[in-house]
Every structure is written in structure tokens, then in C-alpha cells.
């Protein structure tokens, strides 16, 4: 039928394209993997909190001198001129945290090769949000501390980190059923945060570089890579190569935790064709991650926190002095205001620019609640504080007060926001876990089963 004048011909008009949803539910395999990681991190977070509390109580008790004497006790030697006669606090920061960053390297590579970050469309949002969550708190810290001078701005990266173990411990305490999409977003944010943190540590907190030691570190690193590419799992071979890499990176002047990330990056994520291909089971990276994550979350990070979190507050007057210092204020404002605002605004702007919609199961208040959880910066924040101002210095003490206070305030506000929404989260959780045919895959994931 020919349309009359003034009438639009709708027969050939294309249907409007549906808008893409952001923070939508991912695949079942990825959701299940992330749930397993967060369960382990919850236990690690509890141990982390206990270790930090013990350190704080001990450092402010009549036996405080014994705590600081233990932290500053030197153990080691200097064979072949290598500087390995370190304090226990330094061994924890440089040595044990290398295990933590090894797991970070494994996780990063898996995310980029087989996880959500392999898809540019899904990776763009958390990566941009992580950058926003780094830039805004850094700017706030610099604005607050710049008038002080005397190198106060050197700690600009302190309020930019996220402690996933601390964050999921908060979720466990408030018993919230966070939807899978938000859990994935939080973990991916933390993973990208760790990548940015390693880059910042290597670039901005390295004063002098011993090029000879750095060049020599390539030899054991390459041998380690050769072994894992050939799927050699023998720890009697891999461990000495890993330790040798760590020693030489430490000697080079680059922070030794970078060695952990580099070692993690060498481990293959997918099985080779000769080993049966991806369908034959998880790759070596996932195998190592399962083995090392309990050591990282349950031992390495809590021991570091024990030696790093102890600060002699000095009563009410000392706490007042610390809280009024620009470094402390810059960290608190960076974590509580800068971090969530940076993540939230970046997410909101990117969603608007790409003409996408937030997933139907979520509201923007949910995104802000997760952004507040990302404001819990602990492990990496304390490490950067040590690097920026020196372990045991007055400014390092202000860093500890700022990180502890800022993380606590961010956790409390996030807990209130997320707890208010918990009834809705529970309804989403029931939908995401319903498995009427009892085949092990929840019904909502049946169409994307992989």
C-alpha cells in the first residue's frame, strides 16, 4: 500500500538498536572462578584484620619497644656483595609481598588472556574506572600536601590502591549478597589497581638502578619462563630460579615485588595443543594460583600487615596531631572521597558517552557502594608509604594513621549503603543461584554455558 502524503513509510525503517548494558552478568565459568577467589580472600581478610589489630595493640602497649625491636631486627647476610642483611619489616615488605605480587601477576595474565579483560568491550569500563580511581585521589593528596613542601607530595600514590582482602572481609561482616556483576567489577578493579600500583612503584619509587644486576636478573627469569612454558612444575627447579630473580631485582634498586609480577607474567594461562588444549583443563597459571593464593592471603599479606600497621599513636594528643597533619588528611580524603568519586564518575561518564545502560538489576547507588569499598586501601598503600617516606619515619607513622582511618571510614560508609540494598541483593542472589534442573549450572547461565 502506498502511503498517503504526510505519512511516514515505516516498512523499511530499521528497528532501533538495543543499548548495551554495562556491569551485566558474565559467564558462569568466570562467575564461579571469581566466587572461589573471593571466598579465599575473605579468610585472608579476616587474618589480615587480626594481624593489624595485634600490631596496633602491641605498638601502643607497655611492651611497645619489643614490637619495634622485633620489626627492626636484622636477619641475613651479604654474600657476594648482595645487600640481603635486612630487617624483619623489610623482609616482609620486599620478600613476602613478592609472593602476593606473584599471585597478582598470575591473576592479571589470566584476566587478559582468558578472563573478562580479554574482551575490550568488557575491559574498557573497569580499566577506565581504575584509572579514574587513581587520578582523583592522587590529585586530592597533592592539593592537600603541596603547601607543606619538603617532599610531602612524594606519597601521592598512597591513596590510590585497593585492598581486595580487606574489602571482601567487610562484605562478609555485613553478610551482604552482592550480585555477581558487582563482585566481578570489584575484583577486576582491584586487579587493574594492582597492575597500576606495580607500574607506579617501578617507575616513581626507584631512586637508583644497578643496570648490571637488572640485566643479570633476565637470565633466571628467562630460565623460569622456559621451564613453565614446557609445563615443568618441579619446585626444586622453579623455586631457586624465582629466588635468584628476586635477589637480582632487589639488588638492582627496582622494588623486589616487581620480580613477583614478572615471574607471574611468564606462566602460561592456556594449555598448549600438545598438552590437550584449553579443553583438557586449567592451565599452569591457574594451577600455581590455587597453590599460592592461600600462602599469599593467609601468610604473606598478614605478616606484612603485622610489621607495617604498628604505629605508636601516643594517646589522644598524638592521634589529634596525626589526624591534623596534611599527609594524614590527604590520605583520608583521597581514600574516602577521591577513590569512590573517581571510580563512580568515570563509570557514569563512560556509560553516557557509549550510550549504554546500567544493567537492569543494578542502580547507580550500588556502583557507588562498590566504589567506596575500593576506597579501602591497606596493603599496597602501606607499602607505598614505606617507599615514599621511609619505614619508621614520622611521616610514615602519619601514613599508617591515614590509611587505617581512611580505610575504616570508607568501609563503614560502604557497609551502610550496601546493607540498605541487601534485600534487593538477596533477591538477585536467589535468582543467580537457582538451579531447578540440578545440573550444577544456575538457570540464568544456561544460555551461556561454556
Curated annotation (Swiss-Prot):
Transmembrane stretches, start-end: 43-63, 86-106, 124-144, 155-175, 185-205, 208-228, 234-254, 258-278, 299-319, 326-346, 364-384, 398-418
Domain of life: Bacteria
Reaction(s) this enzyme catalyzes, per UniProt: Na(+)(in) + 2 H(+)(out) = Na(+)(out) + 2 H(+)(in)
Chief localization: membrane
Gene Ontology molecular functions: sodium:proton antiporter activity
Gene Ontology annotations for the cellular component aspect, listed alphabetically: plasma membrane
Gene Ontology BP term (one): regulation of pH
Family statement drawn from the similarity comment of this UniProt entry: Belongs to the NhaA Na(+)/H(+) (TC 2.A.33) antiporter family.
The protein's name: Na(+)/H(+) antiporter NhaA 2
Amino acid at each position: 500500500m502506498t502511503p498517503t502524503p504526510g505519512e511516514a513509510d515505516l516498512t523499511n525503517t530499521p528497528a532501533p538498536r538495543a543499548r548495551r548494558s554495562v556491569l551485566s552478568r558474565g559467564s558462569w565459568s568466570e562467575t564461579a572462578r571469581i566466587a572461589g577467589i573471593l571466598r579465599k580472600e575473605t579468610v585472608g581478610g579476616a587474618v589480615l584484620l587480626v594481624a593489624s589489630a595485634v600490631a596496633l595493640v602491641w605498638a601502643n602497649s607497655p611492651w611497645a619497644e619489643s614490637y619495634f625491636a622485633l620489626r627492626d631486627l636484622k636477619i641475613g647476610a651479604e654474600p657476594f656483595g648482595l645487600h640481603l642483611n635486612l630487617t624483619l619489616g623489610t623482609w616482609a615488605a620486599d620478600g613476602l609481598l613478592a609472593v602476593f605480587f606473584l599471585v597478582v601477576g598470575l591473576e592479571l595474565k589470566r584476566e587478559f588472556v582468558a578472563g573478562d579483560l580479554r574482551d575490550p568491550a568488557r575491559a574498557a569500563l573497569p580499566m577506565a574506572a581504575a584509572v579514574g580511581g587513581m587520578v582523583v585521589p592522587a590529585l586530592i593528596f597533592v592539593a592537600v600536601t603541596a603547601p607543606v613542601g619538603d617532599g610531602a607530595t612524594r606519597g601521592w600514590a598512597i591513596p590510590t590502591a585497593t585492598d581486595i582482602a580487606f574489602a571482601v572481609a567487610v562484605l562478609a561482616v555485613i553478610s551482604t549478597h552482592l550480585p555477581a556483576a558487582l563482585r566481578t567489577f570489584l575484583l577486576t578493579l582491584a586487579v587493574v589497581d594492582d597492575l597500576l600500583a606495580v607500574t607506579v612503584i617501578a617507575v616513581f619509587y626507584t631512586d637508583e638502578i644497578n643496570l648490571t644486576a637488572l640485566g643479570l636478573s633476565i637470565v633466571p627469569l628467562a630460565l623460569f619462563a622456559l621451564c613453565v612454558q614446557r609445563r615443568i612444575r618441579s619446585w626444586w627447579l622453579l623455586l631457586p630460579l624465582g629466588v635468584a630473580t628476586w635477589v637480582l631485582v632487589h639488588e638492582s634498586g627496582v622494588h623486589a615485588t616487581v620480580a613477583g609480577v614478572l615471574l607471574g607474567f611468564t606462566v602460561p594461562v592456556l594449555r598448549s595443543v600438545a598438552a590437550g588444549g584449553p579443553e583438557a583443563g586449567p592451565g599452569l597459571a591457574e594451577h600455581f594460583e590455587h597453590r599460592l593464593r592461600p600462602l599469599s592471603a593467609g601468610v604473606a599479606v598478614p605478616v606484612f600487615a603485622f610489621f607495617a600497621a604498628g604505629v605508636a599513636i601516643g594517646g589522644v594528643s598524638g592521634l589529634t596531631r596525626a589526624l591534623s597533619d596534611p599527609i594524614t588528611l590527604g590520605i583520608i580524603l583521597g581514600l574516602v572521597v577521591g577513590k569512590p568519586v573517581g571510580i563512580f564518575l568515570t563509570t557514569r561518564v563512560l556509560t553516557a558517552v557509549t550510550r549504554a545502560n546500567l544493567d537492569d538489576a543494578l542502580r547507580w547507588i550500588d556502583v557507588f557502594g562498590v566504589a567506596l569499598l575500593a576506597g579501602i586501601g591497606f596493603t599496597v598503600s602501606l607499602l607505598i608509604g614505606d617507599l615514599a617516606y621511609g619505614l619508621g619515619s614520622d611521616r610514615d607513622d602519619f601514613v599508617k594513621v591515614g590509611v587505617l582511618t581512611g580505610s575504616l571510614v570508607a568501609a563503614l560508609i560502604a557497609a551502610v549503603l550496601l546493607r540498605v540494598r541487601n534485600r534487593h541483593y538477596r533477591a538477585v542472589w536467589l535468582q543467580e543461584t537457582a538451579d531447578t534442573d540440578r545440573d550444577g549450572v544456575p538457570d540464568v547461565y544456561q544460555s551461556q554455558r561454556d
